[in-house]
From Swiss-Prot:
Domain of life: Eukaryota
GO CC terms: mitochondria-associated endoplasmic reticulum membrane contact site; mitochondrial inner membrane; mitochondrial nucleoid; mitochondrion
Topology relative to the membrane: Single-pass membrane protein
Protein's name in the database: ATPase family AAA domain-containing protein 3A
Major localization listed first in the record, in broad terms: mitochondrion
Stretches of the chain found on the membrane's Mitochondrial matrix side: 264-591
Organism: Rattus norvegicus
Length: 591
């Protein structure tokens, strides 16, 4: 049964590292120091031993040895022994791991403490450096302050020194000038006394010299007079006695006077004639009258105008049927008046802006075979005193036309205002009087056509000189459609089909679109519709492909309508508050 106690077990099985010895008991050291007399004797040691346990163990070993499960029991004992050894080894490993962990923790703590120590040392170094820098800055600032105070003190001392030196210099100069003045006064006084003394002493000599000079001067003058009289007398006597010389002299003086007077008046007359025939008055902005300078500059255009036939008065002018019939009668009457060399009638055309007044005046002149001249009423007031002369020049120039002249005054209400109620300057009043004087009677040389947006502001004398009043109202739906079609053809279709211009029109119903535009542009004038067509052309040119689409036309129409509404709002705001509830004047909207 020796295997049960591990005495005869196989080597290498279940053996592990030796277990650590238990720590010595506190009393072991003291027990080792006891004397030999204190040790118990062998007899006493085994006197209390009970062998019963050993007997039972030996008996159990013999039974187990003879048992058939002896080998399993041995293996079980060995496995238990190995398990215990493994447990001891794992505990040992845990102990070693704990020791290593404790060492690593100690290292980490030491590193943390060292890091904290380094951080604290760094912070202390930084604080010390900042404090030293602060002290250095304070020392530097103190040095600067001390240096500034020292500089200020030196500057103050220098200024005081300069002031003292300046005061000393000024005092020195004043003293020097005072002494010089005293010396000068003494010198002048001495010279005056010496001169007076010399004059008193030489008074008789001076009087004698003056008397001799006067006598000599008188004698010289008398001799000169006698000599000149003798010469002139002899010459006049010789001239009078010779009648041929007298006659020639009188004739020469007469011819000289006549020549000077004739040259002066001839130059003035020639200048006025050249100005009236060749030039153009300053008030005339545009004219179809041909001048010599224009013929020299543009001979081909002038020749075409000379051979051109009279045009239709309403070509390119779209009006309502009633207004068209009336203005056609005026055009026919004007043409027949020119043929019969009768007196022209004065016409007033009033209505909103952009309704075709200026265009009809030009067409009327071309239809009648007359020249036209356009002047603006706003150009008269700035001329001041020259306005009267300029107005007479205009009518003198108009009277020299061989074909007859249609004088169109645009914005005539700018200077033909009421003299009784309106506050106008004296120069403008004189210009108005000159205009009334030149238009007091009808003429067979020129026809006066006035255009105004506010005819109620005319002076009563102007109304008395008007023979025919024509109201140009805003176009209605039919006229607007005709205008839209005409300008669409002029500014869009013709540029798209003629030439090499970068303009194309998308495929849509042009007639239907023109009707829609005419419906949307209610209240707009012919000029606004023309501007709308020009805007279509500009939008097509500004597009990437140069194509005018229906959407682009609609966008421009909406913009034009909004702008027209904004203009109407401005027109309402411009009126006085007392007239805010009243509708606008008929001349601003319709007739």
């Amino acid at each position: 049964m020796s295997w049960l106690f591990g005495i005869k077990g196989p080597k290498g099985e279940g053996t592990g590292p030796p277990l650590p010895l238990p720590p010595a008991q506190p009393g072991a050291e003291s027990g080792g120091d006891r004397g030999a007399g204190d040790r118990p004797s062998p007899k006493d040691k085994w006197s209390n031993f009970d062998p019963t346990g050993l007997e039972r163990a030996a008996k159990a070993a013999r039974e187990l040895e003879h048992s058939r499960h002896a080998k399993e029991a041995l293996n079980l004992a060995q496995m238990q022994e190995q398990t215990l050894q493994l447990e001891q080894q794992s505990k040992l490993k845990e102990y070693e791991a704990a020791v290593e962990q404790l060492k690593s923790e100690q290292i980490r703590v030491q590193a943390e403490e060292r890091r904290k120590t380094l951080n604290e040392e760094t912070r202390q170094h930084q604080a010390r450096a900042q404090y030293q820098d602060k002290l250095a800055r304070q020392r530097y600032e103190d040095q600067l302050k001390q240096q500034q105070l020292l500089n200020e003190e030196n500057l103050r001392k220098q200024e005081e020194s300069v002031q003292k030196q300046e005061a000393i210099r000024r005092a020195t100069v004043e003293r020097e000038m005072e002494l010089r003045h005293k010396n000068e006064m003494l010198r002048v006084e001495a010279e005056a006394r010496a001169r007076a003394k010399a004059d008193r002493e030489n008074a008789d000599i001076i009087r004698e010299q003056i008397r001799l000079k006067a006598a000599e001067h008188r004698q010289t003058i008398l001799e000169s007079i006698r000599t000149a009289g003798t010469l002139f007398g002899e010459g006049f006597r010789a001239f009078v006695t010779d009648w041929d010389k007298v006659t020639a002299t009188v004739a020469g003086l007469t011819l000289l006077a006549v020549g000077v007077y004739s040259a002066k008046n001839a130059t003035s007359v020639a200048g006025r004639y050249i100005e009236a025939r060749l030039g153009k008055p300053s008030l005339v902005r545009e004219t179809s009258r041909i001048s010599v300078l224009e013929a020299l500059r543009h001979p081909i255009q002038v020749s075409r105008r000379l051979v051109s036939r009279p045009q239709d008065a309403l070509e390119g002018v779209i009006l309502s049927p009633s207004l068209e019939a009336r203005v056609r009668d005026i055009a026919i009457a004007t043409r027949n008046t020119k043929k019969n060399k009768s007196l022209y009638r004065n016409v007033l055309m009033y209505g909103p802006p952009g309704t075709g007044k200026t265009l009809f005046a030009k067409k009327l002149a071309l239809h009648s075979g007359m020249d036209y001249a356009i002047m603006t009423g706003g150009d008269v007031a700035p001329m001041g005193r020259e306005g009267v002369t300029a107005m007479h020049k205009v009518f003198d120039w108009a009277s020299t036309s061989r074909r007859g002249l249609l004088l169109f005054v645009d914005e005539a209400d700018a200077f033909l205002r009421k003299r009784a109620t309106e506050k106008i300057s004296e120069d403008l009043r004189a210009t108005l009087n000159a205009f009334l004087h030149r238009t007091g009677q009808h003429s067979n040389k020129f026809m006066l056509v006035l255009a105004s947006n506010q005819p109620e502001q005319f002076d009563w004398a102007i109304n008395d000189r008007i023979d025919e009043m024509v109201c140009f109202a805003l176009p209605q739906r039919e006229e607007r459609e005709r205008l839209v079609r005409m300008y669409f053809d002029k500014y869009v279709l013709k540029p798209a089909t003629e030439g090499k211009q970068r303009l194309k029109v998308a495929q849509f119903d042009y007639g239907k679109k023109c009707s829609e535009v005419a419906q949307l542009t209610a209240g707009m004038s012919g000029r606004e519709i023309a501007q709308l067509a020009v805007a279509w052309q500009a939008m097509a040119y500004s597009s990437e492909d140069g194509v005018l689409t229906e959407a682009m036309m609609d966008a421009r129409v909406q913009d034009a309508v909004q702008q027209h509404q904004q203009k109407m709002q401005w027109l309402k705001v411009e009126r006085p508050d007392s007239e805010a509830s009243k509708p606008p004047h008929p001349s601003l909207l319709s007739c």
